[in-house]
Regions:
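N-terminal lobe of the biotin/lipoate ligase/transferase fold
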Residues: 1-85, 89, 107, 151-152, ...
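Short glycine- and Lys/Arg-enriched binding-loop motifs that mark or flank ligand-binding interfaces
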Residues: 35-40, 99, 121-123
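Acidic (Asp/Glu) carboxylate-rich active-site/surface patches
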Residues: 85-117, 127
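Conserved beta-strand-loop-short alpha-helix elements that form
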Residues: 122-131
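Cytochrome P450 core scaffold surrounding the K-helix E-X-X-R motif
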Residues: 131-140
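Structured alpha-helical
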Residues: 145
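Conserved, helical-rich catalytic subdomain that frames metal- and/or nucleotide-binding sites
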Residues: 149-173
């Protein structure tokens, strides 16, 4: 499957735009934005979207029988594996939906489902701190450039993740 990319400078939320695209008739795609004004995390928590970090949502049709709650960990494992190509430090999955490096959050995902035209869609919102570490209260954060001591290409990282999910999608149809 070839995921169509939709690129934006600023959106309310990449997951919201993905759901709009589904309602417009798109069956799959990737929403990419430089900035989110109302990004969200688990249980409606605000997702802080600092400029230069990576914010995107992948959406596609899945088999109606699949329990999407079981997909969160497998989605995190895909991201963790790709990040491990860049990071030498200990990377861990922190339930329910984060990835940490040295006990600091570097990534979060949000899985949402949408039933539309008798089809079940999965929308996976992904945020990865690449350049800056947002201040989110008592939860320490880090970023990819900080833990690698080098500049990481946002585009190359995004393309690796899209390729990995493109392979996974074939198993979920």
């Amino acid at each position: 499957m070839n995921l169509k990319k939709f690129k934006y400078k600023k959106v309310s939320s990449t997951n919201d735009i993905a759901m709009q695209k589904i309602r417009q008739g798109y069956k799959s795609g990737v929403i990419i934005s430089d900035k989110q004004t109302r990004g969200r995390g688990q249980h409606g928590k605000k997702w802080v979207s600092n400029k230069w970090n990576l914010f995107f949502s992948i959406f596609f049709i899945i088999n109606k029988k699949i329990q999407t709650s079981t997909l969160v960990i497998s989605n995190l494992r895909i991201i963790k594996k790709i990040l491990s190509n860049y990071i030498k430090s200990k990377i861990k999955i922190k339930r329910p939906n984060d990835i940490t490096v040295n006990k600091k959050k570097i990534c979060g995902i949000l899985n949402e489902t949408l039933f539309y035209n008798n089809l079940k869609f999965l929308v996976i919102g992904i945020g990865i701190n690449i350049v800056s570490s947002p201040n989110i209260g008592d939860y320490p954060t880090t970023n990819l450039n900080e833990v690698t001591n080098r500049r990481v290409s946002k585009t190359k990282l995004l393309n690796k993740i899209i390729k990995a999910f493109d392979i996974k999608i074939k198993w979920l149809l």
